[in-house]
Amino acid sequence: MIQDSEFFRMEGVPITKEEIRAVSIGKLNLDPEDVVLDIGCGSGGMSVEISKRSKFVYSIDNSEDAKNTTLNNLKKFNVENCTVSLGNAEDLISKFDFNKVFIGGTQNIEQILEILKEKNIERIVVNTIVLENSVKIINKFEELGYNVDFVNVSVSYGKKINSGHIMLSKNPITIITATLK
């Protein structure tokens, strides 16, 4: 995994943290022939990591800043098997052929999951922070007939203080994996 500090960053554009990227990549169960759609690509951390392990990545974000940040990171890490599109996922999904999906953030998630179901996508991994969104997504996957697995990952970083060491927690992330039955 590439360390977070190595990525180009822009204020207001999120990045999936290194440890969360590692678990999410594992949940995608990537194969060198996979073509992956990255919805809500943010800073492009997942797009860069996925591109190293798959045939091609289509990245989507509805933020111009996110698109530009992702493009900067693709260039920085010499990624040539990824394109970045600006727009809403529900409008762009039909333009691409892919077999796996990573969703790091998006609006209209239920509509997007319905569109992905119509395309018979074999594996979808969704990262969420808000508990209500996690429940909504799990319920939608079950309604659509997917096998669903979910794990909540908490990461704490060590910090030295005068009297010893402490662990500083980051927000826990729920990683939801859906596979076709």
From Swiss-Prot:
Instruction: Give the GO biological process terms.
Output: anaerobic cobalamin biosynthetic process; methylation
> What's the short name of a Pfam family annotated to this entry?
Methyltransf_31
User: Keyword Heme, does the record have it?
Assistant: no
- Could you tell me the keywords of this UniProt record? Cobalamin biosynthesis, Methyltransferase, S-adenosyl-L-methionine, Transferase
Sequence positions that bind S-adenosyl-L-methionine? T16, G40, C41, G42, S43, G44, D61, A89
Q: Which GO terms describe its molecular function?
A: cobalt-precorrin-6B C5-methyltransferase activity; protein methyltransferase activity
What Gene3D superfamilies does the database record attribute to this sequence? Answer: Vaccinia Virus protein VP39
Q: Which domain of life is it from?
A: Archaea
Which ranges of the sequence are coiled-coil? none
Q: Which pathway is this protein assigned to?
A: Cofactor biosynthesis; adenosylcobalamin biosynthesis; cob(II)yrinate a,c-diamide from sirohydrochlorin (anaerobic route): step 8/10
- EC numbers: 2.1.1.196
The reaction(s) catalysed by this protein are:
Co-precorrin-6B + S-adenosyl-L-methionine = Co-precorrin-7 + S-adenosyl-L-homocysteine + CO2
Q: Would you identify the family this protein belongs to, as annotated?
A: Belongs to the methyltransferase superfamily. Archaeal-type CbiT family.
Q: Which NCBIfam families match?
A: CbiT
Q: Which HAMAP family match?
A: CbiT
UniProt-recorded name of the protein:
Probable cobalt-precorrin-6B C(15)-methyltransferase (decarboxylating)
Q: Origin organism of this chain?
A: Methanococcus maripaludis (strain DSM 14266 / JCM 13030 / NBRC 101832 / S2 / LL)
The taxonomy runs: Archaea, Methanobacteriati, Methanobacteriota, Methanomada group, Methanococci
